């Protein structure tokens, strides 16, 4: 069998990898992320060489402004590279160090954020469907090790995907190792830039690349490729688990109008811990928009809250995300200002009475007996001879009591709230209806014995509350 040249061997692998993962379609416009280093220079040349795809390439370079004149020389080199292939060139300068300080990020994380924002902008501006990145199999092994050292679950350890972000970001060189890329560059006679920061072992990735990976290579010469294969296997498992999580999400999680999520505690407790943790992360993402700054400790704290015998509790997560346990519900939402206490309102007769904080109280004179079997918790009837106007609407105060309908003894309103599972943060906003010192109705919870309708009642009022959350 004829041995393929380094160039032909690389092109054959990339073609097969593209066929397997569907990264490119003939005629696609593709933004190529080019730093000027060996891998990205090889990427441009490889994509140009895939003649059968007729790709419409745009070279994009972000100047990180971290290495002074050397950063500017990198930019000029990439521009000349684009000119060599007669490709459009787009660049932008970004003060990554200032961004890192402002956002309290590491230089690595700030640089990554700036690059992806830039690539997104370029793709949108030129109408590109795809952004091609130059990560290869050795990068994959390094990423897996880095995340393993920092601590990660299955999703993190599956590392980089050949096709990510819904098909937007593709990594055609994951099929290749560093040595194959270097042999390709040498065979093609391609020059590239050397970034001295890549040798700085102050960065974790560089320590892994220059110290840990060579050590593992001495233990097993194929360690890097096997680590990359492990990441691929984990990614396959993760795809299956993600499908199971999505199915559980539809069954167990209710998405709120405000963009948060509510889950049943009893339902969560019946699920395996691994699935619970994934559901928590999904619920946080619904409320927050992403999972940035969410750690294992946060997710573990939520699980303890769900499993606790205490029926209520709350957790404050980064970026104003609040997780609240209230009896059999756990809610994930962006924290809002505390709900204010209800302002006092005097009711002197029938009409629509707006309530502070939203909603209204509707008072009507009744002409017939109550439809006892059809009354909702937002409606109550009163004997006007026993409780004539004016009435007072106000919020709950510690010490408030009432005689509930059908009982002879008093009960604390706080205990009524607990029985009805009213969240603690809502209690001071629940309307209480008084006639003098007598509490007639804890709206949405319990009616009082005072002024109840009897067979002998002649003058009656029906009161309804509308447009207000009561539980």
Swiss-Prot record:
Gene3D superfamilies listed in its UniProt record: 3.30.465.60, HUPs
InterPro entries on file: Lysidine-tRNA-synth_C (IPR012796), Rossmann-like_a/b/a_fold (IPR014729), TilS/TtcA_N (IPR011063), tRNA_Ile_lys_synt (IPR012094), tRNA_Ile_lys_synt_N (IPR012795), tRNA_Ile_lys_synt_subst-bd (IPR015262)
SUPFAM superfamilies with a match to the protein in the record: Adenine nucleotide alpha hydrolases-like, MesJ substrate recognition domain-like, PheT/TilS domain
Catalytic activity: cytidine(34) in tRNA(Ile2) + L-lysine + ATP = lysidine(34) in tRNA(Ile2) + AMP + diphosphate + H(+)
Pfam families according to UniProt: ATP_bind_3 (PF01171), TilS (PF09179), TilS_C (PF11734)
One GO CC term, this protein: cytoplasm
Binding of ATP, residues: 35-40
Keyword terms, alphabetized: ATP-binding, Cytoplasm, Ligase, Nucleotide-binding, tRNA processing
One GO biological process term: tRNA modification
Taxonomic superkingdom: Bacteria
Domain topic, free-text comment: The N-terminal region contains the highly conserved SGGXDS motif, predicted to be a P-loop motif involved in ATP binding.
Protein name: tRNA(Ile)-lysidine synthase
């Amino acid at each position: 069998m004829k041995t393929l040249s380094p160039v032909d061997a690389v092109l054959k692998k990339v073609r097969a990898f593209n066929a397997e993962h569907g990264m490119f379609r003939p005629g696609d416009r593709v933004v190529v992320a080019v730093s000027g280093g060996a891998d990205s220079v090889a990427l441009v040349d490889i994509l140009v060489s895939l003649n059968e795809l007729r790709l419409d390439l745009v070279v994009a370079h972000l100047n990180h402004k971290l290495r002074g004149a050397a950063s500017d020389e990198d930019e000029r080199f990439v521009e000349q590279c684009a000119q060599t292939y007669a490709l459009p060139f787009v660049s932008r300068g970004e003060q990554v160090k200032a961004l890192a300080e402002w956002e309290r990020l590491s230089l690595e994380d700030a640089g990554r954020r700036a690059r992806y924002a830039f690539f997104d902008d370029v793709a949108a501006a030129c109408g590109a469907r795809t952004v091609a990145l130059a990560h290869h199999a050795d990068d994959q092994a390094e990423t897996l090790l880095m995340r393993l050292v920092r601590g990660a679950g299955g999703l993190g350890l599956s590392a980089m995907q050949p096709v990510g972000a819904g098909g937007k970001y593709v990594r055609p060189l994951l099929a290749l190792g560093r040595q194959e890329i270097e042999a390709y560059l040498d065979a093609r006679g391609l020059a590239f830039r050397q970034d001295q920061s890549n040798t700085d072992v102050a960065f974790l990735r560089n320590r892994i690349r220059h110290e840990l990976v060579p050590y593992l290579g001495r233990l097993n010469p194929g360690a890097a490729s096997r680590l990359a294969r492990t990441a691929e296997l984990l990614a396959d498992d993760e795809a299956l688990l993600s499908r199971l999580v999505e199915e559980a999400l539809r069954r167990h999680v209710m998405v709120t109008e405000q963009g948060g999520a509510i889950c049943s505690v009893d339902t969560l407790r019946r699920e395996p811990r691994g699935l619970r943790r994934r559901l928590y992360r999904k619920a946080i993402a619904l409320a927050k928009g992403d999972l940035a700054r969410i750690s294992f400790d946060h997710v573990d704290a939520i699980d303890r809250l769900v499993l606790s015998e205490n029926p209520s509790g709350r957790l404050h997560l980064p970026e104003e995300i609040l997780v609240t346990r209230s009896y059999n519900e756990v809610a994930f939402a962006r924290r809002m200002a505390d709900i204010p206490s209800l302002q006092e309102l005097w009711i002197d007769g029938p009409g629509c009475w707006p309530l502070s904080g939203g909603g209204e109280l509707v008072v009507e004179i009744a002409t017939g007996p109550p439809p006892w079997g059809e009354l909702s918790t937002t409606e109550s009837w009163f004997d006007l001879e026993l409780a004539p106007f004016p009435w007072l609407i106000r919020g709950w105060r510690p010490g408030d009591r009432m005689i509930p309908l059908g009982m002879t003894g008093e009960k604390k309103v706080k205990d009524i709230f607990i029985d009805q599972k009213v969240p603690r943060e809502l209690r001071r906003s629940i309307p209480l209806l008084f006639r003098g010192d007598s509490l007639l109705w804890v709206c949405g919870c319990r009616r009082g014995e005072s002024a109840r309708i009897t067979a002998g009642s002649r003058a009656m009022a029906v009161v309804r509350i509308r447009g207000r959350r009561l539980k």
